[in-house]
């Protein structure tokens, strides 16, 4: 199931062009950041839908990832300042340098399931759930090269609580930028599916 899900969603050319276009617009504002060519982001605050219908909206795409760490319960003022993808990347970089987040993830691999309901991160046997991120609580997703020269990419999620009082950052490591972008594409499709179904 894992391979099918990954193969099916990674072949979506229309979503790929949307992600890469957004990536280029981010690159132009990066200045001298060495990772500029590998940044892609998904801003879920936007209510713009691509208008594509997804017949498999109930399916769940699964990806093997590793968990780096999280910064939970950020104050409202702190979280609001983390609007753009660069804000998130810089914040995570500083947190890693300050020891609040590790540079290297745990050895254990987890399964990240992405569907129209959100994201579920569970153990590889899928008996234990590590995290659940409801779709409506995900504010932004950013993927970028980890900068360690290993070819791995980081996937960062910015979420809020049900009352919009606190923000949290969740950081996962992907095997490649392609895998990280595939996760962004699936999540983008999930948002489009929900937005399309809500239209009268």
From Swiss-Prot:
Phosphorylation at Thr-38 seems to enhance integrin alpha5beta1-mediated cell adhesion. The degree of phosphorylation is regulated by integrin-dependent cell-matrix interaction. Residues 1-10 have a biased composition (Basic residues). The modification Phosphothreonine is found at residue 38. One of its GO terms (biological process) is negative regulation of focal adhesion assembly. Residues 139-141 are annotated as: Interaction with ITGB1. It comes from the Eukaryota. It holds the Pfam family ICAP-1_inte_bdg. The keyword Phosphoprotein applies. Transmembrane segments: none annotated. Residues 34-56 have a biased composition (Polar residues). Residues 1-56 are annotated as: Disordered. One of its GO terms (molecular function) is integrin binding. GO terms for cellular component: cell periphery; cytoplasm; cytoskeleton; cytosol; lamellipodium; nucleus; perinuclear region of cytoplasm; plasma membrane. It is found in: Nucleus; Cytoplasm; Cytoplasm, Cytoskeleton; Cell membrane. InterPro entries: Integrin-bd_ICAP-1, PTB/PI_dom. Interacts (via N-terminus and PTB domain) with ROCK1. Found in a complex, at least composed of ITGB1BP1, KRIT1 and RAP1A. Interacts (via C-terminal region) with ITGB1 (via C-terminal cytoplasmic tail); the interaction prevents talin TLN1 binding to ITGB1 and KRIT1 and ITGB1 compete for the same binding site. Interacts with KRIT1 (via N-terminal NPXY motif); the interaction induces the opening conformation of KRIT1 and KRIT1 and ITGB1 compete for the same binding site. Isoform 2 does not interact with ITGB1. Key regulator of the integrin-mediated cell-matrix interaction signaling by binding to the ITGB1 cytoplasmic tail and preventing the activation of integrin alpha-5/beta-1 (heterodimer of ITGA5 and ITGB1) by talin or FERMT1. Plays a role in cell proliferation, differentiation, spreading, adhesion and migration in the context of mineralization and bone development and angiogenesis. Stimulates cellular proliferation in a fibronectin-dependent manner. This is Integrin beta-1-binding protein 1. The lineage of its organism: Eukaryota, Metazoa, Chordata, Craniata, Vertebrata.
